A protein has these predicted regions:
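PRPP-associated nucleotide enzymes
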Residues: 1-172
Length: 172
């Protein structure tokens, strides 16, 4: 569906866009990059290496899938950030936005902690699956409403290690 070279090219483009934003808008202030675990770790690690600006790394865990292929609709925080974000610029880095529920939840949760700004980046965006209105500031690819794996995305813990993104068919 999306091969390794396309992913690398797009992640580098996003890194350049975020670098330009940081240099223009943030001046000498760091950007805290919050990786949403587990699925975003590959995208996150490649993205932060493509950014030539002052960034800080942190991690947050959130789940709305469990072992299913469709969101349960209930978002749970499974791991919190380790540093205060009050008065800071924050970017949530997510693997995929489908229903929008997770990003909406995280955005509201982090905004309540009084950062200067909360932004978001997502590798994949499924506009046809949206249940709440949410659009990331930076999007890698828009895709159809299919279940996908690879490049950090999994099915019941499997396939995260694929270097590409593949559509899963005939799940039973």
């Amino acid at each position: 569906m999306i091969d390794e070279k396309k992913i690398a090219r797009r992640v580098n483009e996003l890194g350049k866009e975020i670098t330009q934003f940081c240099n223009k808008e943030l001046k000498n202030e760091p950007l805290i990059m919050a990786c949403v675990l587990k699925g975003s770790f590959m995208f996150y690690s490649d993205l932060i290496r493509a950014i030539d600006a002052d960034i800080r790394t942190d991690f947050i865990g959130c789940s709305s899938y469990g072992d299913a292929t469709k969101s349960t609709g209930e978002v749970k925080l499974t791991l919190d950030l380790t540093h205060s974000i009050e008065g800071k610029h924050v970017m949530i880095v997510e693997d995929i936005i489908d229903t929008g529920l997770t990003m909406n939840y995280l955005s509201k949760t982090l905004t309540a902690r009084n950062p200067k700004r909360v932004m978001s980046a997502a590798l994949l965006f499924k506009p046809d699956a949206m249940k709440v209105k949410f659009k990331a500031d930076y999007i890698g690819f828009e895709i159809a409403n299919d279940f996908v794996v690879g490049y950090g995305l999994d099915y019941q813990g499997y396939y995260r290690n694929l270097p590409h993104i593949a559509r899963v068919e005939n799940l039973q």
